[in-house]
């Protein structure tokens, strides 16, 4: 059984397979936050074309988090920042919490490999990332197991 996140946004829905077996701490944290509605209504506060869309900051400016930090899991398999990969944002090793980004372009994100934890991959609705603009809202993130 696989774990997926259904990320509903103002621009459409994305379905991402989460790497629960490979990055268990990061996925457990994301699933817990999503399950408690943490992400509901938050914005994509950082959008850089051909690089990333980033959300998950309760302050909406990139400085907020859940009030705790989690460890990086960068030695796991599938740690390539390809287009559509979900990765944990942080301000330095082991400082991630709730902010995550989705990669738009492998060429411009390869330098993040081994630095940020890749914890999922968009498998449906990948075109939505191209439509997201700064300030667009995450309506909800729902976790499903199939």
Regions found by a protein language model. Give the residues of each.
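Cyclophilin-like peptidyl-prolyl cis-trans isomerases
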Residues: 1-146
């Amino acid at each position: 059984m696989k774990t997926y996140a259904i990320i509903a946004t103002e621009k459409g829905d994305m379905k991402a397979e989460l790497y629960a077996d490979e990055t268990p701490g990061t996925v457990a944290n994301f699933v817990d936050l999503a399950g408690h509605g943490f992400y509901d209504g938050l914005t994509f506060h950082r959008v850089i074309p051909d690089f990333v869309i980033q959300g998950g900051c309760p302050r909406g400016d990139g400085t907020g988090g859940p009030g705790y930090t989690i460890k990086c899991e960068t030695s796991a398999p599938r740690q390539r920042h390809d287009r559509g990969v979900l990765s944990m944002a942080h301000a330095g090793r082991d400082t991630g919490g709730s902010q995550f980004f989705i990669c738009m372009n492998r060429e411009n994100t390869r330098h993040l490999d081994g630095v940020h934890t890749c914890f999922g991959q968009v498998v449906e609705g990948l075109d939505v990332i191209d439509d997201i603009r700064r300030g667009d809202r995450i309506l909800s993130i729902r976790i499903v197991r199939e």
